[in-house]
Amino acid sequence: MKKYLALALIAPLLVSCSSSNKKGAEYNEAWVKDTNGFDILMGQFAHNIENIWGYNEVLLAGPKDYVKYTDQYQTRSHINFDEGTITVETIAGTDPRGRLRQAIVKTLLMGDDPNSIDLYSDVDDIQISKEPFLYGQVVDNTGASIRWEWRAARFADYLLQTRLKSRNNGLRVVYSITINLVPNHLDKRAHKYLGMVRQASRKYGVDESLILAIMQTESSFNPYAVSHADAMGLMQVVQHSAGRDVFRSQGKSGLPSRSYLFDPANNIDTGTAYLAMLNNVYLAGIDNPTSRRYAVITAYNGGAGSVLRVFSSDKVQAANIINSMAPGDVYQTLTTRHPSAESRRYLYKVNTAQKSYRRK
């Protein structure tokens, strides 16, 4: 869900709104200010990394990338949840092996609480967990899963002896180790959240397979997921748009905090509640459940307003046009005529992923 989603969700086109235009303008102004402020901070952070690592070496956390810097930003751990790799690198001029060893051990044994780690600082706040987040997703050179510090340390020593690489980036020498996750790492992560998904599914009447497909597409089941639009967590919920809408529908004031949305259970609950709102409120005028599902999926990414405007500028007429079409034609229209290329691809990705979860 992108940051412009907030504007689409409060548009009169979608829902009747009792607040005045002045209040709406104030809401939009505050949202833009917060979002622009976040963009500025991220730009400054990226600039600092570039100054230390070099021009083509900027690496930041994202929806499907965990990136944590330590050692005055000279060492970093990167988990690419799409490719299934862990890469630990350092440009430290002193004891690079020791710094890599420590980073490997801590990355392998970190927990799954995003609120405990600041991805936008070099503070070494990674706590070794008795239940590591990556347990079962990576195995050592003997084929064993890694839960204990002694095993992680032994594996780190093995990696330093057999897989250490170095390269010169023109500014620094970069030492690195790459570890592959197990082939079914995606399923391993998904399994961690099945209980939460089932609970949210029952609570809001949203199909489990759709929730899982959204999570896979948004974050690849990365609880640390962040984005340039300040979307957070497993379902990439934006505080000022979907988060605020859900809170309002639940009789809560304000919007969910960052710590609230980085809690996996809260994130799944909020994301699922928003899917239910799209289905039962914003896009309720679409009669065919399959057509409505296609619209809901696309709206989760780009807003309900943009979905309806593909068919007509009038929301009632848009629903009537959709209702006159076969579901396959609705899918074809949304994947070819939606103004956002990202939203067009999003429907294809989520629909494909949902089919795989329905078969499981």
Curated annotation (Swiss-Prot):
- Annotated keywords: Cell outer membrane, Cell wall biogenesis/degradation, Lipoprotein, Lyase, Membrane, Palmitate, Signal
Q: Where is the lipid attached (N-palmitoyl cysteine)?
A: C17
Give the range the annotation lists for the signal sequence.
1-16
Keyword Transmembrane helix among UniProt keywords: no
Q: Which Gene3D superfamilies match?
A: 1.10.530.10
Corresponding gene?
mltC
Q: What is this protein called?
A: Membrane-bound lytic murein transglycosylase C
- The disulfide bridges present are none
Function description = Murein-degrading enzyme. May play a role in recycling of muropeptides during cell elongation and/or cell division.
A GO BP term here is: cell wall macromolecule catabolic process
Native species of this protein?
Answer: Klebsiella pneumoniae subsp. pneumoniae (strain ATCC 700721 / MGH 78578)
> Organism's domain of life?
Bacteria
